[in-house]
A protein has these predicted regions:
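Extracytoplasmic/secreted envelope proteins and their assembly/folding machinery
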Residues: 80-84, 96, 100, 104-111, ...
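Short, Lys/Arg-enriched N-terminal segments with co-localized hydrophobic residues
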Residues: 1-5
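Peri-catalytic and regulatory segments of divalent metal-dependent proteins
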Residues: 48-186, 232, 252-255
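Short glycine/threonine-rich beta-strand-turn micro-motifs
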Residues: 334-353
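C-terminal capping/extension segments of zinc metalloprotease domains
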Residues: 24, 28, 40, 44-81, ...
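Post-HEXXH active-site segment of zinc metalloproteases
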Residues: 54, 177-207
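Bacterial N-terminal signal peptides that target proteins for export
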Residues: 9-29
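C-terminal non-catalytic accessory extensions
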Residues: 347-350, 355-379
Length: 394
């Protein structure tokens, strides 16, 4: 739970004592891993009512004790620090000053943004560190303890996209997704062990719909990340741009991503939903599809690739800049150029590379379409993308 790209790693057919099962549940939280219930045995036909009642009592007692520990590590300051220290020991700490400064800056900005949406963040300010893992991931564990993999910084040179990843994890933290998931897991594991047959554990799993909550939680965290971003100067198109980048960069090694696809929404779905958030933020004026940005249903620009960023990824950043302009009423002023940058009021829209259309041409086009009425049924109802990490001045 909470990990950007984490999936079940608990081995099948391994028998644990109740204490070890609970410990496994809690330990997995350090890595924000969803748990498997494959260790619960097949129901016994001889299990009667008395067995089930006894299992209920045993499960309640065991889960109550485990929940007391869970509450300690999740909510008390002492427990949060113990958990944070364990996370650092478990994952390793990268002392790189540049990466840590970037994380510090983003966390400072996002913490203020989260507070504007949910003041409860002040009750448990986030602890965070950069770990040594070179893969792409970030996770929020118990007690608002967070970590970002070193590899995430390498894959995402844009601070806007990095901020979206971190905002996503803070969304998990604010909604207590990790603790809630562990709580369910403890109850199921305790109940299953108490029967010795897995009958109650199987029923509990069905009733609580345990791991099936992962996709809704991921969607909720993405939506919260977008909301947090709109309370900062980061580009609101960063979420859509991020998922476009992930799809493109991981084509050559899909196996590294297939580990989590059953637990998380697909990358293209997450991109499209985030682009819809951007369109809504613009008041329905700005959309993007297939690398083309539309304003009021009319083609504005198809950004070219630049550096290691594709035209499609850039288009989501352009969409984000335009959405910010419309949201903040900069569209009431004329578009113009500052060198190779197209401006709309005080809002930068796109920094044109040599492969893009001329900035003056784009400014003239934007002036011609920004006040027109949206064309129903046009491609603007699809999705949005944005340019190379330009920030939204709000």
């Amino acid at each position: 739970l909470g990990g950007f790209f984490m999936k079940n790693t608990v081995k099948k057919n391994v028998k644990f004592s109740l204490k070890k099962k609970i410990a496994t549940v809690l330990t997995a939280a350090v890595l924000a891993l969803p748990l498997s219930y494959s260790t619960i045995s097949t129901p016994s036909a001889s299990a009667g009512t008395a067995d089930i009642i006894g299992a209920v009592l045993g499960g309640i007692q065991a889960s109550s004790e485990a929940n007391a520990l869970l509450k300690k590590y999740d909510q008390s300051e002492e427990g949060r620090q113990i958990w944070f220290d364990y996370m650092k020991k478990k994952n390793g700490v990268n002392p790189d000053p540049n990466l840590n400064q970037r994380l510090e800056r983003i966390m400072t900005n996002l913490s203020k943004a989260v507070a504007a949406v949910d003041p409860s963040i002040h009750e448990r300010p986030y602890n965070y560190f950069v770990n040594k893992d070179k893969s792409f991931n970030a996770f929020c564990s118990l007690g608002h303890n967070m970590s970002v993999n070193t590899g995430t910084f390498y894959l995402l040179p844009s601070e806007d996209e990095l901020a979206f990843v971190i905002g996503h994890e803070m969304g998990h933290g604010q909604k207590n997704h990790v603790a809630k998931g562990i709580n369910k897991s403890i109850w199921i594991q305790a109940a299953g062990q108490a029967t010795g047959t897995g009958v109650l554990g199987e029923w509990a799993a069905e009733i609580l719909d345990s791991t099936q909550n992962t996709k809704p939680q991921e969607k909720e965290a993405d939506k919260l990340a977008f909301e947090y971003i709109t309370h900062t100067n980061y580009n609101p198109g960063a979420g859509a741009a991020l998922w476009q980048r992930v799809m493109e960069k991981m084509k050559s090694s899909p196996s590294s991503w297939q580990r989590f696809t059953s637990d998380h929404p697909s990358d293209d779905a997450r991109r499209d939903v985030n682009s819809k958030y951007v369109a809504d933020y613009s008041g329905g004026h700005v959309t993007a599809k297939d690398g083309i940005v539309y304003v009021n249903g009319q083609t504005f620009v198809k950004p070219a690739a630049h550096g290691d960023m594709s035209g499609a990824e850039r288009s989501y950043f352009v969409q984000g800049n335009l959405a910010a302009a419309f949201h903040n009423k900069h569209n009431e002023k004329p578009a113009y150029t500052e060198g190779n940058i197209v401006m709309l009021g005080d809002q930068p829209i796109i920094s044109c590379s040599n492969a893009d259309e001329n900035a003056a041409v784009l400014a003239d086009r934007l002036n011609a379409i920004k006040d027109s009425k949206s064309v129903k049924g046009s491609k603007d109802s699809k999705k949005t993308r944005t340019n190379k990490g330009e920030k939204s001045k709000k």
